[in-house]
A protein has these predicted regions:
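Radical SAM enzyme [4Fe-4S]-AdoMet core and its adjacent flexible, acidic
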Residues: 134-246
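Conserved alpha-helical substructure of the radical SAM core
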Residues: 1-74, 78-89, 93
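Flexible mid-to-C-terminal extensions adjoining Fe-S/redox cofactors in radical SAM and related proteins
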Residues: 257-314
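Alpha-helical scaffolding segments of alpha/beta enzyme cores, especially the outer helices
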Residues: 57-60, 82-92, 113-116, 148-151, ...
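C-terminal accessory regions of radical SAM enzymes
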Residues: 233-267
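Short loop/turn motifs at secondary-structure junctions
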Residues: 34, 66, 121-122, 162-166, ...
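Core AdoMet radical
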Residues: 22, 42-51, 65-80, 91-110, ...
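Conserved, mostly hydrophobic/aromatic
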Residues: 31, 149, 301
Length: 314
């Protein structure tokens, strides 16, 4: 029994899937950045991407089942040739469409079309900006990324984002610590970005770093693995359990495989029925009531104020 399971047992809690609200599509590992905290291990040299035949099956499923939200992530999902078609299909089906954007992709050659495309389809942008100061951003995401991110945010503002279209930012701690209070940090971000750069955005989401992939490698290299897991376990908040995203989100890989969350996907903890299930094997109702696969990494979502792809939970 791992530390997360012990916490569930202590609090007499269990995790089961509820009605599906969000279909989260991870459509590849390729990215124009290679961030230190990235749980996907995304990078420019990664080649995994969504193939046209798989994309067509996913689009058929969206047309049939019309989930409330289609959340598209990666990598930099915009690098995938199937990205445009997925956005168009989900938008036409009446779904809220979310793009998890690293911002710098907007400044890459041949991607000048993105801001106008986003606004045309009223895509909600959730963009990573781990700090409102250059030092921390460049440390976590690479030299020059802060300045590019600011330019990209200003470009999005020019296309109505932060006003008529939703623009949210994401904060990750730089090191092995819990995020600060989300509402207080949001106020700091808004003041700094508006005063220094004239930037407007809607909400800030704080997300706890998952002890997997590159961040796990950093923890072990710094001999802080046990210390960080102990911090997460000691900060367990049972009030976060009811709002965990794995209850209502279905994560789908670029090959169509199913997972309870994107973090489980990176650990290959497939949803199975004797064998790994594909999206086109199921309906949303088929998943309701199924136990959620968990591991020690789940402590990151239940520590402190809780954590999810849309920020704090409790």
């Amino acid at each position: 029994m791992n530390r997360f399971e012990k916490q569930l047992q202590t609090h007499k809690a269990s995790l089961k899937r509820e009605a599906l609200l969000t279909l989260q599509l991870n459509i590849g590992r390729q990215c124009n950045q290679a961030c230190r905290h990235c749980h996907v291990d995304a990078a420019p040299w990664r080649t995994e991407t969504l193939a046209p035949d798989i994309a067509n099956r996913i689009k058929d499923w969206i047309r049939t089942h019309r989930p409330q939200t289609v959340d598209i992530t990666g990598g930099a999902p915009e690098l995938c040739p199937e990205f445009r078609g997925l956005v168009q299909t989900a938008s036409k089906a009446g779904c809220e469409v979310i793009d998890r954007c690293n911002l710098t992709i907007l400044l890459e050659d041949n991607f000048e079309w993105l801001p106008e495309f986003f606004s045309q389809h009223d895509v909600t942008i959730i963009a990573s900006l781990p700090c409102y100061q250059p030092k921390n951003v460049n440390h976590q995401r690479g030299g020059g990324v802060f300045d590019k991110s600011i330019r990209a945010l200003q470009l999005l503002n020019q296309h109505g984002y932060g006003e008529s279209h939703a623009l949210h930012l994401v904060y990750n701690p730089v090191g092995p610590s819990l995020p600060p209070d989300q509402s207080e940090l949001e106020a700091d971000y808004k003041e700094a970005l508006h005063c220094d750069f004239g930037i407007h955005f809607d909400r800030l989401f704080t997300i706890t770093n998952q002890p997997i992939a590159r961040f796990a490698e950093d923890l072990r290299r710094q001999d802080k693995w046990d210390e960080y897991l102990e911090l997460l376990s000691n900060s367990f908040n049972p009030e976060s359990l009811e709002s965990l995203m794995c209850r209502s989100t279905l994560s789908v890989s670029h090959e169509g495989d199913l997972f309870d969350c994107d973090f489980n996907q990176m650990l290959e903890l497939n949803i199975r029925n004797g064998k790994p299930l594909k999206l086109w094997d199921i309906t949303p109702a088929d998943l309701e009531g199924r136990p959620i696969l968990t591991g020690e990494h789940c402590l990151a979502c239940t520590a402190g104020s809780g954590s999810s792809c849309t920020g704090a939970l409790a």
